[in-house]
Swiss-Prot record:
GO terms for molecular function: 8-oxo-7,8-dihydroguanine DNA N-glycosylase activity; class I DNA-(apurinic or apyrimidinic site) endonuclease activity; damaged DNA binding; zinc ion binding. This is Formamidopyrimidine-DNA glycosylase. A zinc finger (FPG-type) spans 240-274. Monomer. Gene3D superfamilies: 1.10.8.50, MutM-like, N-terminal. It comes from Bacillus cereus (strain ATCC 10987 / NRS 248). InterPro entries: DNA_glyclase/AP_lyase_DNA-bd (IPR015886), DNA_glyclase_Znf_dom_DNA_BS (IPR015887), Formamido-pyr_DNA_Glyclase (IPR020629), FPG_cat (IPR012319), MutM-like_N-ter (IPR035937), Ribosomal_uS13-like_H2TH (IPR010979), Znf_DNA_glyclase/AP_lyase (IPR000214), Znf_FPG/IleRS (IPR010663).
Length: 276
């Protein structure tokens, strides 16, 4: 699933490709992707004649701002936005096509069909689901070690499960939580309330630095991720633990292990990340 670094790189490349283009028509071939309004035909009619003004990101969501509305899109596991010419073949996994007046088309492709789109009037998007209950952005001033400490000390859930909760902070998924906890030297099954202030400080620092580095490297291409210009990321080359079960730890040489935490495959070093 694309996490913050991947979605941010999609946002940047997509904004360069489609800002200023006017939507002539919308073709939806898999209506279940459109969650709001509940009729894809209405979604289509509302967007006709709208011009894309800018594209923002909130957590793992893309926000496409048009003249009067905002399309809130979640890519889920395999979603991709790619620009095409009108005479190019249409991939069988293309489920939404935004046809522009200049003859180009923005295709939303999704092999798994798990992605979603919500359409809101401008100004309504942040106060309604799916954005309303999201936590702070990792790079915002609102996220501090103190913010994390106040919330982590109130829960006995395992720290990996807590960091995956987008209500605490946004953007971390399975890949980057494993990497953050390795850099923090915290076992993924530690109870959040057991963490010291110094350990929480390490988690905060690792979150900001890991995500920042991943954004600069274009994200991580583990399976099929590409940005909207068709480019893969390169941060996968710097991963320390994710997907590396059975390999030696880069720090101590111990063989990395994999377990399941909160239903998610979890990679860690049993020496560098002791379960206290």
């Amino acid at each position: 699933m694309p996490e913050l670094p991947e979605v941010e790189n999609v946002r940047r490349t997509l904004e360069n490709l489609v800002t200023g283009k006017t939507i002539e028509d919308v073709i939806v071939t898999y209506p279940k992707i459109v969650k709001r309004p509940d009729d894809a035909k209405i979604f289509k009619e509302m967007l006709k004649g709208e011009t894309i003004e800018n594209i923002k990101r909130r957590g793992k969501f893309l926000l496409l701002y048009v003249t009067n509305y905002v399309i809130v899109s979640h890519l889920r596991m395999e979603g991709k936005f790619l620009l095409h010419q009108e005479d190019e073949p249409i991939d069988k996994h293309t489920h939404v096509r935004f046809l522009f007046t200049d003859g180009t088309e923005l295709h939303y492709k999704d092999v798994r069909k798990f992605g979603t789109m919500h359409l809101f009037k401008k100004g309504e998007e942040m106060n309604q689901m799916p954005l309303a209950d999201l936590g702070p952005e990792p790079f915002d001033a609102e996220l501090t070690p103190q913010y994390l400490q106040e919330r982590l000390q109130k829960t006995n859930r395992k720290i990996k499960v807590v960091l995956l909760d987008q209500r605490l902070l946004v953007g971390l998924g399975n890949i980057y939580v494993d990497e953050v906890l390795f850099r923090s030297q915290i076992h993924p099954e530690r109870e959040a309330s057991s963490l010291t202030a110094e350990e929480i400080e390490r988690i905060y620092e690792a979150t900001v630095t890991t995500l920042g580095e991943a954004v600069k490297r274009g994200g991580s291409t583990i399976r099929t991720y590409i940005n909207s210009q068709g480019q893969i990321g390169s941060f996968q080359e710097l991963l320390n633990v994710y997907g590396k079960k059975g390999e030696p730890c880069v720090t101590c040489g111990t063989i990395l292990e994999k377990t399941v935490v909160g239903g998610r495959g979890t990679h860690y070093c049993p020496i560098c990340q002791p379960r206290i």
